[in-house]
Design a protein with these regions (language model features):
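A detector for small-residue-rich transmembrane helices and their helix-helix packing motifs
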Residues: 1-155
């Protein structure tokens, strides 16, 4: 029996949290990310990872979640196949924590962040590096990265 893809498992977990979030929007406050000063004062460092589990549910369409999961699947699947489960997870979590720290430092004291975008942008970076090493065409990936970056400021 073929083992389940790590990417599919992550998507299932994140989407499961989103469904729970629809029933209890307080989960965003439990798992979302604060600005660095509040993060330090509360000592809730787990939020650097749990931020990926919660997404905006304030509108009727889960656009933020959909874009993150589409990117996770589109980028994560070939990266996991090429590099293996362990290296994929290292890239995912290092990117997630790095993106969360960058976000926390830029938020200020009362800022708040949600979503898996930090991990997704890390996967974009890994995809570009792999593509360059394999002499692949990465121009279209760069365009998608730019579009996702711009979209991040509109959602």
């Amino acid at each position: 029996m073929k083992s389940r893809s790590t990417v599919i498992s992550l998507i299932t977990i994140i989407c499961g949290f989103y469904l729970y979030e629809l029933l209890d929007s307080g989960i965003i406050g439990t798992f979302g990310l604060y600005g660095i000063e509040l993060l330090k004062s509360t000592n809730e460092w787990y939020r650097l990872v749990t931020v990926a589990l919660v997404h905006d549910n304030s509108n009727t369409l889960p656009i933020h979640l959909a874009f993150n999961m589409l990117a996770l699947h589109s980028l994560g699947t070939p990266i996991e196949q090429f590099m293996g489960r362990t290296k994929f997870l290292v890239i995912f979590f290092v990117s997630l924590i790095g993106g969360s720290l960058l976000s926390a430092y830029s938020l200020g004291y009362n800022g708040y962040s949600i979503g898996a975008s930090g991990a997704v942008f890390g996967l974009f970076g890994a995809f570009v590096v792999i593509g360059k090493r394999m002499n692949g065409e990465i121009k279209s990936v760069i365009i998608v990265i730019a579009l996702n970056f711009a979209l991040g400021f509109t959602i």
